[in-house]
């Protein structure tokens, strides 16, 4: 797998937005030309569903085991890989911004292994 493509519609919630954009040669990479989903905070690009983003997460996804803590929901790219990993017992995602949750969570794959908490990671205390 070279890319985890998300199925999140365009939208705005507070200072966050999801946009579909056509890209060619993204950030000077050999990214295939096509439409990509991008999460923005104000006008700052936070995350996209590109092969580059997947490569940045690949080692973590391959090595994950036990009870996994994910700091930030982003586009929810890691959810499906983690929940389908037989070495992962549970996935706890801590997302600081309710606006990101409102835009993304309903469109993410999830099962009984995955739970989402709205909190700043440094303020959150595990059960």
Language-model-derived ranges and their functions:
Residues 1-67:
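Class I S-adenosylmethionine
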Residues 2-7, 52-126:
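The AdoMet/dcAdoMet-binding core of the Class I SAM-like
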């Amino acid at each position: 797998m070279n890319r985890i493509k998300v199925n999140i519609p365009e939208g705005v919630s507070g200072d966050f937005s999801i946009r579909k954009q056509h890209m060619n040669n993204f950030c000077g990479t050999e990214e295939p030309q096509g439409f990509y989903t991008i999460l923005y905070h104000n006008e700052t690009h936070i995350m996209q569903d590109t092969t580059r983003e997947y490569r940045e997460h690949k080692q973590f996804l391959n090595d994950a085991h036990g009870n996994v803590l994910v700091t930030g929901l982003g586009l929810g790219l890691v959810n499906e890989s983690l929940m389908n990993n037989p070495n992962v017992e549970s996935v706890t995602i801590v997302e600081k911004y309710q606006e990101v949750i409102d835009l993304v969570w309903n469109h993410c794959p999830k099962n009984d292994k995955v739970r989402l908490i709205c909190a700043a990671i440094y303020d959150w205390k595990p059960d």
